[in-house]
């Protein structure tokens, strides 16, 4: 298990080294800035494919009617809506996010669609979840783990609140596997994406950070190992779209 950033005192914010205690605030400023344009951000970062990734992520999850699910870094609620379709009227989805602005957007969006029953909204830090042990049948986090300061602590907390027999799933931008595609992907990430962010959201810096944060996130095998160290069993991952994103899964047994 790697040393906690809070112990070493420093961590990364994109390609910058910053004090570990400051990263949460810096990340919060990014997501407060992009909250109202979050779906646009994902469209720009993924060329629109994120919607298919998310549908597959939920469709292949271990979940059944009546289950209680926690969706961390739940953002604008798109994953939560898909999960609610799986758990049905008897089940419940808790949408958790550390950023109040993102949580507000998600709540407003679902309420405006008439989706009220069976959803709860909790502002929470993935490193210290405010839930009892063994609270959830399934735990998901999509495009959020890379922004967490202490990922090991977050994975341990995910394991703690998961019921025995439950599954945790992580959908995250990862390491591209095709060498020929890497220069194209880098060009899009560092040359095109910030300009699109400036053009459509008047915010090039946030989009620059988001591109950099992907490169600092642990690659597939490393994250699989981190999940195992946190206690998860039967850990595995599946690359999507040539490793642009990966789905990691682990179980509490």
UniProtKB/Swiss-Prot annotation:
GO molecular function, one term: 2-methoxy-6-polyprenyl-1,4-benzoquinol methyltransferase activity
Name under which the protein is recorded: Ubiquinone/menaquinone biosynthesis C-methyltransferase UbiE
Organism for this UniProt entry: Xanthomonas axonopodis pv. citri (strain 306)
Gene: ubiE
SUPFAM superfamilies: S-adenosyl-L-methionine-dependent methyltransferases
Superkingdom, natural source: Bacteria
Keyword entries, A-Z: Menaquinone biosynthesis, Methyltransferase, S-adenosyl-L-methionine, Transferase, Ubiquinone biosynthesis
Gene Ontology biological process terms from the UniProt entry: aerobic respiration; menaquinone biosynthetic process; methylation
PROSITE patterns, per database record: SAM_MT_UBIE, UBIE_1, UBIE_2
